[in-house]
Amino acid sequence: MTSGSQGAFEAARRIVFKVGSALLVDAETGAANRAWLEAFCADAADLRAAGKQVLVVSSGAVALGRRRLGLTGRKTTLPEKQAAAAAGQSLLMRAWEEAFEPHGIGVAQILLTRDDTEMRRRWLNARATTETLMGLGVVPVVNENDTVVTEEIRYGDNDRLAARVAQMAGADLLVLLSDIDGLYTADPRKNPKAQHIPRVSEITPEIAGMAEGANAAAGVGTGGMATKIAAARIARAAGCATLITLGSRPRPLAAIAAGEKATLIEAGASPAAAYKAWIAGSLAPQGWVTVDAGAASALLAGKSLLPAGVRAVEGPFDKGDAVRVRDENGREVARGLVRYDSADAQRIAGLRSDAIEAELGFTEGPMIHADDLAVAH
């Protein structure tokens, strides 16, 4: 019989895997755990061969950099931690490159701060880069930019970063590889009566309380069960399910596919539906775009908004802002994230798509892409 976790894993087409320092870095030597990385990448290659897309959110740069700079065995200051991150990033990426290379898979590093997933313009740019990399068959390896991040703009832990990446990438599954095989009613290492919870349909206060009670103290990283539930809450709101499972198994991803013990936290909706609901209901529109009847019909049919169908632009708004789209009778037909600021949108209104670059010197494609449009009902 297929478990809920196993079924979700099989059905997922785009998966974000969060790998913590405790898995990636050997606690005794402070070096990359090559054997574990090779096993993970072999499993990831099998997933890609099955038609799935894989993204990795990887800790480890600071831990690897501490060893390189001789900062182990004591508490580090913030500047020392940032220096360790700078020294460790190349070591981290080299480890991932070497582990994926035998499978003919390339990797690319993406460094983010919280602003990159919360400021819409930067969010759109990060999403476009991620999509391009995956389209080229490359595995994005994402980490927080610890070299420049400050307390005000840091995620705090890579569980929440992974959830934001899953949201940004439109993933349908987030896998948090942990030091425990899922959520329990209490910490099973302290309470022999603790019961495993295989499936969570809603994150209730009771579930959050269990996570607090079962919070694991990590030896190398910063995340515990409470942060994983917080991450799952973010992912769930974005239409992405979350799997919490034991990452230290010899073939961690194959173990999920085989139905080994894990906790599945179900998604609230599909990623696309959740994203469009966010556009429609959570963002304050910054301007108006008036379109002709043909463009209005195309939008209602699920098409992108091309500049040729735009009759008027009212701003000001920036690239990435939400705008209202109305027909020539003043009826709102959609809301969406615009790919041009209001000044550029006014310049290309009414132009054919192949004339945009000649007018602006660049092109971002349609004025609003269909993926970034929520049609009014």
UniProtKB/Swiss-Prot annotation:
Which coarse location class describes where this protein primarily resides? cytoplasm
Q: What is its EC number?
A: 2.7.2.11
UniProt key word Nuclease: no
In this chain, ATP is annotated as bound at K18, S178, D179, T222, G223, G224, M225, A226, T227, K228
Biological process terms from the Gene Ontology for this record are: L-proline biosynthetic process
Q: Is Acyltransferase one of the keywords UniProt gives this record?
A: no
Identify the residues that bind substrate: S59, D146, N158
Task: Tell me which GO cellular component terms the UniProt record holds.
Answer: cytosol
The PUA domain is annotated at 286-363
Cross-referenced SUPFAM superfamilies, in alphabetical order? Answer: Carbamate kinase-like, PUA domain-like
Q: Which SMART domains match?
A: PUA
Where, per UniProt, does this protein localize?
Cytoplasm
Query: Which Gene Ontology terms cover its molecular function?
Result: ATP binding; glutamate 5-kinase activity; RNA binding
Domain of life the protein comes from = Bacteria
Keywords assigned by UniProt?
Amino-acid biosynthesis, ATP-binding, Cytoplasm, Kinase, Nucleotide-binding, Proline biosynthesis, Transferase
Q: What is the annotated role of this protein in its UniProt record? A: Catalyzes the transfer of a phosphate group to glutamate to form L-glutamate 5-phosphate.
Family classification: Belongs to the glutamate 5-kinase family.
Give the protein's recorded name.
Glutamate 5-kinase
| Species this protein is from | Caulobacter vibrioides (strain NA1000 / CB15N)
Q: Which gene encodes it?
A: proB
